[in-house]
A protein has these predicted regions:
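Structural alpha/beta surface segment adjacent to cysteine/selenocysteine redox centers
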Residues: 1-62, 132, 136-137, 141
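C-terminal cap of thioredoxin/glutaredoxin-like
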Residues: 58-141
Length: 141
């Protein structure tokens, strides 16, 4: 219906040693290989999170069709790191301290308002919160 937008933000937690490298790599795979490559990379990172290393992250990106030299350049680019840092700052403003976390509500520019949902939830729980947010948005028009 076009009424819902799903936005992924990075929140590499400091106690996960490879989290920042994984976030950088996933963001670079999206930039270099597109949306489908990003989702394949994200899935591979989650499936392998217990054994992530710089070498494995590079191999997984290669499996998504990303050239290792281009990946390394992207991951070393200050702009890539700044975008992840901005996501971390936004999470802090929203009170998000862990993953997975979701904000279901409305966004106007850089301002997001809504309900914070922390942790894995059932499809029913998400559906109810999304329907609630859609009703509130409709009523405020």
């Amino acid at each position: 219906s076009g009424k819902v937008r799903y936005v992924v933000k990075d929140l590499p937690l400091p106690f996960h040693g490879q989290a920042r490298g994984a976030a950088l790599a996933a963001r670079c795979v999206a930039e270099l290989g597109g949306r489908e490559a990003y989702w394949r990379m994200a899935d591979a990172l989650f499936l392998n999170q217990a054994k992530l290393s710089a070498e494995l992250i590079e191999r997984l990106a290669g499996e998504q069709g990303v050239d290792p030299a281009r990946l390394a350049a992207c991951m070393a680019d200050k702009k890539t790191a700044e975008r992840i840092d901005a996501d971390v700052q936004e999470a802090g403003r929203l009170g998000i301290t862990g993953t997975p976390s979701f904000v279901i509500g409305t966004a106007k520019g850089d301002i997001v308002t809504g309900t914070l949902v922390v942790g894995a939830q059932s499809e029913t729980a998400f559906s109810a919160r999304i329907e609630d947010a859609l009703k509130k948005a409709e009523a405020s028009r």
